Amino acid sequence: MANLEVTLAGLNFRNPVMLASGILDSTPGILKRMAETGAGALITKSISLQGRPGYPGPTTVEIAPGTWINAMGLPNPGLEEFLEEFPLTSLKVPVIPNLVADTAKEFE
């Protein structure tokens, strides 16, 4: 089998295939399964300091026949609850947080 290991920004990945933020990173069980079935890294859903409810539905709109866009409003439980709910240290692959903030100061 080919060796697909890569190093990026000082992180070692068993392969360059990463699970992007989206539907498949919405529960701890799914993240664990993705790590076990070959993802080189996992990128979390959006995480903010304080929880966000997201936009009320509908969150999709058809902009042309057969062409849809969505905007969820970055719903998330907030950093503390996320860390309690998602046992990231038990995963055997790098986890890249998708951090969002209302101001640059929140990133400090």
Protein language model annotation of sequence segments:
Residues N3-F13, M18, I23, P28-E108:
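Active-site entrance/lid segments in N-terminal catalytic domains of soluble metabolic enzymes
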